Amino acid sequence: MKGKFIVIEGLEGAGKSTAVNTVQQFLRHFKIQDVICTREPGGTALSEEIRHLIKKKSQNEEILTDKAELLLLYAARVQLLENIIKPALSSGTWVIGDRHDLSSQAYQGGGRGIKSEFIKSLADFTLGSSFRPDLTLYLDLPPELGLQRARKRGHLDRIEQQSLVFFERIRARYLELTYDDPRIKMIDASKPIKKVTVDIQNALLSLLEK
């Protein structure tokens, strides 16, 4: 039996890492032991190098352009997809992804203002138009709360240092995409962790019952 692909999405500080652990524990409770976790950008040796390029602040005067950022993200994504995710799913392993294609639609589309049609065509070319996660959990919260949480973790990377308005645009695009796709379930990540955990578990139950 083919594995399932579950993706966790959200702004900085939304609690994606905690949600990944919640999903993994829930699947184990239902005797689903063959599970791997991935992150984007990253997940392969080459993709991790690309992650470093995207996340770090430039040490010289060269600025990473918005289009270059988008192309790097899809290069990292297709490496992860073809080398890790697809083989795992084909072998019956479940995959829990910390971010996937929806991030680029929200961050580069909503945040950077790159046309959604171009991002879709790039996604179709690199990932294939028929490949989609079985379930995406979008952890929604106000950007100011997410950034407050992110600052408590310590040093902010290049993306996390963007303006509040940037993250407001991202959230708006996330919400727009969520309403348009029944496979994306919105979780209110501003609520207490116990409530967030229950909401995630309920969304997973719906997937398992299909």
UniProtKB/Swiss-Prot annotation:
HAMAP family: Thymidylate_kinase. This is Thymidylate kinase. Keywords: ATP-binding, Kinase, Nucleotide biosynthesis, Nucleotide-binding, Transferase. InterPro entries: P-loop_NTPase (IPR027417), Thymidylate_kin-like_dom (IPR039430), Thymidylate_kin_CS (IPR018095), Thymidylate_kinase (IPR018094). GO terms for cellular component: cytosol. It holds the Pfam family Thymidylate_kin. NCBIfam families: DTMP_kinase. Gene3D superfamilies: P-loop containing nucleotide triphosphate hydrolases. Transmembrane segments: none annotated. GO terms for biological process: dTDP biosynthetic process; dTTP biosynthetic process; dUDP biosynthetic process. Belongs to the thymidylate kinase family. ATP binds at residues 10-17. GO terms for molecular function: ATP binding; dTMP kinase activity. Its EC number is 2.7.4.9. It catalyses: dTMP + ATP = dTDP + ADP. It is an enzyme of class 2 (transferase). The keyword Ribosomal protein does not apply. It comes from the Bacteria. Phosphorylation of dTMP to form dTDP in both de novo and salvage pathways of dTTP synthesis.
